């Protein structure tokens, strides 16, 4: 069962869920991927926290992660690019695989882009300021 740490914003969670449904070759309802979705839009705003203008959402993210695991999630995803600023902290002590939207995006780009290609990132000001994608690009080579 996949645990979805979502609600930041809710439409990103809905978009992720729809993409999983469309990518599943299900012949009937019971053939779909089981998911637990936590959609909590009350989690502290990520952009403000990254820019030093608000409180950190990390305690709420950790609580959501732990709730999903306690409810039976066997793997986790978080369909919010900006929240991946806290991804390293969310991995600490995590007892199930936690997939990174940033790692997955960059690995997919590596297959699609030709050597020497320029790639642009459309993201929030905070995501760009935090260099979430830049740091992962360096880490993954």
Indicate where each model-derived feature is located.
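Non-catalytic structural scaffold of enzyme domains
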Residues: 1-141
């Amino acid at each position: 069962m996949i645990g979805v740490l979502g609600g930041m914003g809710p439409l990103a969670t809905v978009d992720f869920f729809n993409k999983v449904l469309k990518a599943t070759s299900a012949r009937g309802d019971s053939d779909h991927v089981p998911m637990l979705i936590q959609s909590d839009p009350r989690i502290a705003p990520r952009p403000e926290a990254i820019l030093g203008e608000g409180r950190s959402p990390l305690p709420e993210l950790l609580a959501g992660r732990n709730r999903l695991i306690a409810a039976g999630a066997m793997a986790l995803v978080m369909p919010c690019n900006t929240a991946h600023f806290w991804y390293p902290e969310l991995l600490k002590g995590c007892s199930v695989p936690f997939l990174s939207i940033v790692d997955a995006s960059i690995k997919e780009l590596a297959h699609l882009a030709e050597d020497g290609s320029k790639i642009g990132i459309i993201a929030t000001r905070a995501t760009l300021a935090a260099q979430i994608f830049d740091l992962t690009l360096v880490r993954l080579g």
